[in-house]
Amino acid sequence: MANIKSAIKRAELNKIANERNAQQKSAMRTLIKKFEAAPSEELYRAASSTIDKAASKGLIHANKASRDKARLAAKLG
């Protein structure tokens, strides 16, 4: 465990950020699974939006975002 006050604070902030990132990635995966179960234009837009947001925040690589969106689009039509 950290002894320095700033290190303790950084550790706590890292924990909070880690939880937030995990929650956002989980939400993205959930929307992708919902779309794959029942493809529709509305679910495609929602999944695509969450993928773009994850990529812009650095949660996933830009190439992965592009690949995921292409796979969803292929399943849509």
UniProtKB/Swiss-Prot annotation:
GO terms for cellular component: cytosol; small ribosomal subunit. InterPro entries: Ribosomal_bS20, Ribosomal_bS20_sf. It comes from the Bacteria. GO terms for molecular function: small ribosomal subunit rRNA binding; structural constituent of ribosome. Gene3D superfamilies: Ribosomal protein S20 (1.20.58.110). Pfam families: Ribosomal_S20p (PF01649). One of its GO terms (biological process) is translation. The keyword Ribonucleoprotein applies. Binds directly to 16S ribosomal RNA. Belongs to the bacterial ribosomal protein bS20 family. This is Small ribosomal subunit protein bS20. It comes from Lactococcus lactis subsp. cremoris (strain MG1363). The lineage of its organism: Bacteria, Bacillati, Bacillota, Bacilli, Lactobacillales. The gene is rpsT.
